[in-house]
Amino acid sequence: MKQIRPYILLLIVSLLKFISAVDSNIEGPVIGIDLGTTYSCVGVFKNGRVEILNNELGNRITPSYVSFVDGERKVGEAAKLEATLHPTQTVFDVKRLIGRKFDDQEVVKDRSLLPYEIVNNQGKPNIKVQIKDKDTTFAPEQISAMVLEKMKEIAQSFLGKPVKNAVVTVPAYFNDAQRQATKDAGTIAGLNIVRIINEPTAAALAYGLDKKEETSILVYDLGGGTFDVSILVIDNGVFEVYATAGNTHLGGEDFDQRVMDYFIKMFKKKNNIDLRTDKRAIQKLRKEVEIAKRNLSVVHSTQIEIEDIVEGHNFSETLTRAKFEELNDDLFRETLEPVKKVLDDAKYEKSKIDEIVLVGGSTRIPKIQQIIKEFFNGKEPNRGINPDEAVAYGAAIQAGIILGEELQDVVLLDVTPLTLGIETVGGIMTQLIKRNTVIPTKKSQTFSTYQDNQPAVLIQVFEGERALTKDNHLLGKFELSGIPPAQRGVPKIEVTFTVDKNGILHVEAEDKGTGKSRGITITNDKGRLSKEQIEKMINDAEKFADEDKNLREKVEAKNNLDNYIQSMKATVEDKDKLADKIEKEDKNTILSAVKDAEDWLNNNSNADSEALKQKLKDLEAVCQPIIVKLYGQPGGPSPQPSGDEDVDSDEL
């Protein structure tokens, strides 16, 4: 690469050795997961190519929704269907809460917009729902874990074997706390997160795997809830990130909210009814506005019709593409600020960008495409990859790299999104690792004491670009004590920052005089889940998995019994089957047993799977001997299936 930083070739070699040494111990399949705000996607690298996997409905993206209704947990497509019926019991957009504090400005805003209850649990936002008439709270990590578990199940269904390892993507501008919280979610889901990679970097892998000549690309990743921009240079299998910027609280959900606010005001003006007081009405509107937004990517006008949005009132309004663009114009243009920032950080002119790669469902919006094209002086963005699947595709490639799946020559060099440093006297932010430094990386700096005979130093670690620590984000702190008495400035305290391949920071301080040291892994600052909390959440997740399994078994057993009842009815009453061949007494015996079973089924809706299976056996014990007796008769029937035999397809 012409612009490659001087030390990069050495780093590439060490990275290759690092990857082969660390990742060679990983066994079994490794899947790639795009854990999105609104939708998630999973892929796997198999037989030399990436497969993006379908969910149970045949869709390649799955809603990041979890619902708790009538004691039953649903995840994905089924959960999203509950949103309009049970808005306070359906959880979504949890990516906007994960790794944040309860009083964060963005969380405060979301609390007023989301229909479910968000409560304060030791300074962290937790979600409160009712399960079996009891209030139950979940950390955002637990809800994300349920979505990850769903992705794992989709992969296991495709591969036909257990999956324990995954590469998971996060927004490039996720801070340390949000990254660690995402790893915790993976642990709760029973996954070993072998790598966390940035979403635009994953998309670049998807776009540029076959690129041999040096190519500079700008990845513009606008999803449902987050926005990232990265500049990368791809050269013969080496993917080097030069700069990254973004906004972890900007995306399609915000565009929807602008439209919703517009229609809420209009409805109140016409009907003197505030829809905000009715959570079900808001969810109905949210659903239709999202559909309208998608439609406006291909048409210029669409009608929104909601019958009985509130009692006695229908909703019928037209939304034009022009109005949608007007309502969101400032948000659309806000996305250009990170674009300008990465160009400045990478010291790139617009003309030096070879390709603009659009990623994320929101980049389908025509106005977004127009704004980007105009900003780059008429250059057409590349539309060669599926914006919904590109990130999962890249994550699957990274998974293949880790397993050594014909991708040994691909090297990924990502960067730190924010500057890392410590507080020194006067509240100064002393930088150790600057933003856009290639990772993994390590940096040491020597400090000293401020006062004579100072016995300890407090190491406070911050993240951000401001000169004073009060304007930056505190990641964590620890104390190094036992410093021998000495004059101010004499003790030598070496502070070492190490950022690993997942972008997670480790900090160590050592008194060079005594050799005494202390360190911490900076994770989710004071809000990080403890080991005990994670263990409990793993147990809770297993309990939910058991409950889901029991529910599936119950539904299956109930269906088997009901199918057998209907089959026996048809068998003895249909002239094409046994009606003309069976003796009257035998027919009455079967019909009587069938009626008893039907009545029992109607009166025992809460029966467990074992009781249902036993009832089926009891019914079979009455019916089967009669059916078998007829097999030997001339012109006798074909054998009837028992209730627990496999049939060609499940009933809907």
Swiss-Prot record:
Regulation (activators, inhibitors): The chaperone activity is regulated by ATP-induced allosteric coupling of the nucleotide-binding (NBD) and substrate-binding (SBD) domains. In the ADP-bound and nucleotide-free (apo) states, the two domains have little interaction. In contrast, in the ATP-bound state the two domains are tightly coupled, which results in drastically accelerated kinetics in both binding and release of polypeptide substrates. J domain-containing co-chaperones stimulate the ATPase activity and are required for efficient substrate recognition.
Which family, according to UniProt?
Belongs to the heat shock protein 70 family.
This chain belongs to the protein called Endoplasmic reticulum chaperone BIP
A single GO molecular function, which one? Answer: ATP hydrolysis activity
SUPFAM superfamilies for the chain? Actin-like ATPase domain, Heat shock protein 70kD (HSP70), C-terminal subdomain, Heat shock protein 70kD (HSP70), peptide-binding domain
CDD domains tied to this protein: ASKHA_NBD_HSP70_BiP
Cited function: Endoplasmic reticulum chaperone that plays a key role in protein folding and quality control in the endoplasmic reticulum lumen. Involved in the correct folding of proteins and degradation of misfolded proteins. Acts as a key repressor of the unfolded protein response (UPR).
Q: Which organism is it from?
A: Plasmodium falciparum (isolate NF54)
Read off the PROSITE patterns from this record: ER_TARGET, HSP70_1, HSP70_2, HSP70_3
